[in-house]
C-alpha cells in the first residue's frame, strides 16, 4: 500500500514539472483565440511571434532547478550532455507540435501551422547550437529575444506572408540543419555549468 502511494506521488510530482509549460501553452492558445476574435491578422502575427517560443521556453525552464523536480536525477545521470539536450528538445517539440498545428489550422489552415512548426524547429535548433557557448537557460532567452526581434523587423518591413512563405520555410529548414550540424561538431564544447550549479 505504501509503495503504491509513493509511486503515485512520484507520478504526480513528475506531472507537476510540466505545469509551467502547460500554463504557458494555455496562455498562448487563449491569446491566439482572443486576438482572433478581434482581428485575424493580429492573431496570425501573435501566433507566428509566440508559437515557436513554446518549445524553447520549455527547454530553458527544464534546466531551472526550482521548476524541474527531476533536476538532481538529470545532473547525476550517466548520459552525455548532448543526449540529454537532444532528448529534452525532442520532447518539447513533440509536445508543441499538436498545439501549433491545431492553432495554425484554426487561424489560416494546416499549411500555416506546418510552416510555423518549421520555424519552431529552427528556433530550437539554434538554441541547441548556442548551448555550446552558454548555459541552456541563457541560450533559450537569447534565442527567444532574437526570434521576437526578427519577426518584428520582418512584419514592419514586409508582412506576415514574408515569414510564412515557402522561401522563409526553406531558410528555416536550412538554418535548423546547419545549427544541428554545429551542435554535433561542437558537442564537446557544450556548457555543463548547469550540472554543477
Regions found by a protein language model. Give the residues of each.
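Hydrophobic alpha-helical transmembrane segments
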Residues: 1-44, 132, 171-197
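Short, mixed-charge, low-aromatic patches
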Residues: 28-30, 55-58, 80
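Juxtamembrane helix-entry segments on the extracytoplasmic side of multipass membrane proteins
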Residues: 48, 167-170
Amino acid at each position: 500500500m505504501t509503495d503504491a502511494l509513493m509511486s503515485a506521488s512520484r507520478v504526480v510530482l513528475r506531472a507537476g514539472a510540466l505545469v509551467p509549460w502547460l500554463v504557458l501553452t494555455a496562455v498562448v492558445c487563449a491569446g491566439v483565440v482572443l486576438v482572433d476574435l478581434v482581428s485575424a491578422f493580429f492573431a496570425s502575427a501573435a501566433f507566428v511571434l509566440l508559437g515557436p517560443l513554446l518549445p524553447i521556453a520549455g527547454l530553458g525552464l527544464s534546466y531551472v532547478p526550482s521548476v524541474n523536480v527531476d533536476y538532481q536525477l538529470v545532473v547525476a545521470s550517466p548520459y552525455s550532455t548532448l543526449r540529454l539536450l537532444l532528448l529534452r528538445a525532442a520532447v518539447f517539440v513533440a509536445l508543441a507540435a499538436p498545439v501549433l498545428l491545431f492553432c495554425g489550422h484554426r487561424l489560416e489552415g494546416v499549411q500555416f501551422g506546418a510552416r510555423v512548426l518549421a520555424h519552431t524547429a529552427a528556433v530550437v535548433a539554434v538554441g541547441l547550437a548556442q548551448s555550446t557557448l552558454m548555459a541552456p537557460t541563457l541560450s533559450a532567452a537569447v534565442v527567444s529575444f532574437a526570434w521576437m526581434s526578427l519577426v518584428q523587423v520582418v512584419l514592419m518591413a514586409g508582412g506576415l506572408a514574408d515569414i510564412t512563405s515557402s522561401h522563409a520555410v526553406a531558410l528555416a529548414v536550412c538554418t535548423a540543419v546547419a545549427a544541428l550540424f554545429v551542435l554535433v561538431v561542437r558537442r564537446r564544447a557544450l556548457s555543463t555549468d548547469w550540472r554543477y550549479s
